[in-house]
Design a protein with these regions (language model features):
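Sensor-regulatory modules in signal-transduction proteins
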Residues: 125-128
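Regulatory sensory and allosteric helical modules in signal-transduction proteins
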Residues: 72-73, 79-94, 98-111
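Short hydrophobic/aromatic beta-strand element in the GNAT-like acyltransferase core
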Residues: 40, 110, 122
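Juxtadomain coupling helices with adjacent low-complexity linkers
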Residues: 92-100, 104-108, 116-117, 134-172
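Short loop/turn motifs at secondary-structure junctions and domain boundaries
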Residues: 33-34, 112-118
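Amphipathic alpha-helical effector-binding/dimerization core
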Residues: 2-89
Length: 172
């Protein structure tokens, strides 16, 4: 026996049914433990983004978001990722150049964008067909985001985003 092209619809069905939350959660715990920053996972829903998973930093001063919290899609680091990758979403505050830079770099760093004393780094999570599936962020007090730490945080979350994307069927 040998596989034919008929397997593709079944494979696509399987890959699109993968649960990004279930795949991402153990990685989110690991990166939280490594970086001591809160880790969040967002999905787009119309003009909003929803936090579907959260692993809070284990320290008294942290950026706190609750699972199920809904935000305007264009706010914060996660919103900038959605704005750069979703064709049907255009943020009036984001230029075509900024959008192209985000897609080229594959991440966004914000400081005080949505919450004055918080900083965040966001990366896209892709699925089968390299479709934007979700956005993962790490966030914490703005004082934690020194130049040296940002390099460490960025390196870790970019690797994590690529790892989860590959498990979701992306071919980056």
């Amino acid at each position: 026996y040998q596989l034919s092209w008929g397997i593709l619809p079944m494979a696509k069905s399987f890959l699109t049914s993968l649960d990004v939350r279930a795949i991402a959660q153990p990685y989110m715990v690991a990166i939280r433990n490594q970086l001591q920053q809160s880790v969040n996972l967002f999905l787009a829903q119309g003009d909003y983004r929803i936090c579907i998973e959260r692993v809070a930093a284990d320290k008294p001063l942290r950026h706190d978001i609750k699972i199920g919290t809904v935000y305007p899609i264009f706010k914060g680091a996660a919103g900038k990722i959605f704005g750069a990758y979703l064709a049907d979403f255009k943020d009036a505050d984001m230029s075509a150049g900024e959008s192209a830079k985000i897609r080229r770099d594959g991440y966004v760093i914000t400081r005080g964008n949505r919450v004055p004393d918080a900083a965040s780094i966001a990366v896209p999570i892709f699925s089968f067909g390299n479709k934007l599936e979700a956005v993962m962020t790490i966030s914490g007090p703005i004082g934690d985001y020194t130049e040296e730490r940002v390099k460490e945080y960025l390196s870790a979350i970019r690797v994590l985003g690529q790892t989860i994307s590959k498990e979701m069927g992306a071919t980056l």
